[in-house]
């Protein structure tokens, strides 16, 4: 069996199979008996393949599970974060298998064992997290414990609820108070589980003037409670946060506890900051949670334990009500939910538990201290000494801001400044978060959208550090990546307005304001048949933009270009990505306009040529038919009779008629094929008009990519050479215009020798000057053209 397990590529599955085999060997008192089949059973076609025959061995089944987990080899690898399962993780996984085995014991042994496991785990959690004189309820879904607590509160406040049911609630409606910063969907979940209507929920807003904007407004909550009491409602339960789901801020739990005691409201606390109760130093706001009526803990996430249930600790003296509410159960299977946590806590010990929580807090503090030294990064910090969650975002520094602007609470910033910052930086922060997630996946970053602060990046090591194995070096790498992305972010933000002005000042281009695009901007080319009022798709415009995208990508610039429909309509647009500081926006916009115009003209030229060819063919058919009729009139009817016509043609041969017509694509005209048959050479036809030359492209240095500004003051090009280069270009332009004027005079019989001498002298002068400009390839090419 051990040799077979070594064939499995996934070490986690192999280790788990080995642990399960070892546990079964130790726990079983007698060797397992194998059942012999009495005869070969007939194979039914309705039975799936894996179930046919005598079954599969464990190695084959584990290999099948491994293939299902990692997918086929042909599929592209997905960038999914796989949790790092350590020894403590194997203990948690082993607990589920042991739970299934323990459930086969006799009832008395099972009762004693499950009672011991449940009581030990409850006592350990109460001592670790400073919650005295409480009971524990273990549940798989995090919100399930709160739903049971709400049911317990209903039974406690409504004594006749067991007899009269919801009629009691109808006469005096219960009210459950939730913070506006609570996790999404929590209120709807509670109403669905309890069978209560949505008006029983009361959403308490957060602070707007003083304190954190993610903390519950206590004064407003008290006003809501008084209003509900006056209306004949019953304030039932309040859910407070010790670490909100978004930014990890803690409510004023001490003040909320006093308010709940005054009105007889059940206080329930949840949040990631409850993990810090295991540390030696705890902030006063979090420490106040130990006096609440109930709290929900998630030790599996904090300690990196897979498939470990959440725990709800509560205080209540009536066992009958807790049994009715579902918080306690006589079923052994319900008590065995604590077995994985019971094994894992013993394996880690108190020092291991505290060390893991302390490590996560140190990671967050390390990131906070490093981000303070980074410009253009704002940190949403509640308590710098104890906050285990770091939320930050990129922002454009205001002119009147000082060095302490980044560390102050967001509520102290002017609302107008926050609005401008959010409007211009949300897309860039979303791009920054996605880039950091790819570059440093060990940090477990998430991108969040906050109602007040906009798009931010969250680092919560308490929820991810143990599973991903986050270290201090990963935080340092994260800071390095942030610093490397800041120049691109600041330059892109600065170039946005310049790009908008250039596009609005260029004929044929329309600036598209897309707030969700993080690049320089979005532009659309308006062709001749473009309808601005229509929001439907434009096939002609899509064709032009597709060709434009291909041309722009062929330039091999540092910019990224994408095509997609405008977010307000179905029309195609060109999306320009992030940029650095040396991007020439004017050249970029001019190139887009000229290239799109050329594509449109070429498309129309092809359409016109198709129409000309079609009309030419029709005209040729008409002329040939007319020529055939004239030939019949000249030859007469007798020549058309087979025998008679041959005799007449022998006595009086007819002259050869025209052979046909040819269509000159260059000239766009019909021509006779007589010249071709006589001279055996196809005629040149009419000389086509000269093709107009496009606009002269910007002169670039060797190796310089498109849309790059000239490097002034560099070693490659000095200021003197730049000035002389510009002067030489002007002389070449003057020379070309002078040559055109002299050529016109040369055709007149008045002064032909003088014009020729002038041209020769100017050419010779420029040729001598070009010998000192060996690196100026553009001048050499111009001189060769003039020569």
Swiss-Prot record:
Q: Basic and acidic residues compositional bias: what residue ranges?
A: 26-44, 725-748, 772-787
One Gene Ontology term of the molecular function aspect: pyridoxal phosphate binding
Q: Which cysteines are joined by disulfide bonds?
A: none
Polar residues bias spans: 759-771
A Pfam family annotated for this chain is: PDXDC1-like_cen2
Phosphothreonine modification sites are 687, 691
* Needed co-factor(s): pyridoxal 5'-phosphate
Keywords from the named record: Decarboxylase, Lyase, Phosphoprotein, Pyridoxal phosphate
Do you know which InterPro entries this protein is assigned to?
GrpII_AminoAcid_Decarb, PDXDC1-like_2nd, PDXDC1-like_3rd, PyrdxlP-dep_de-COase, PyrdxlP-dep_Trfase, PyrdxlP-dep_Trfase_major
Biological process according to GO? carboxylic acid metabolic process
**Location of Phosphoserine modifications:** 652, 710, 718, 722, 748, 778
| Entry EC no(s) | 4.1.1.-
Q: Where is this region: Disordered?
A: 26-52, 682-787
Q: Which PANTHER family match?
A: PTHR42735, PYRIDOXAL-DEPENDENT DECARBOXYLASE DOMAIN-CONTAINING PROTEIN 1-RELATED
Q: Which family does the entry's similarity section mention? A: Belongs to the group II decarboxylase family.
Q: What is this protein called?
A: Pyridoxal-dependent decarboxylase domain-containing protein 1
**Organism for this UniProt entry:** Mus musculus (Mouse)
Q: What is the lineage of its organism?
A: Eukaryota, Metazoa, Chordata, Craniata, Vertebrata
Gene name of the encoded protein: Pdxdc1
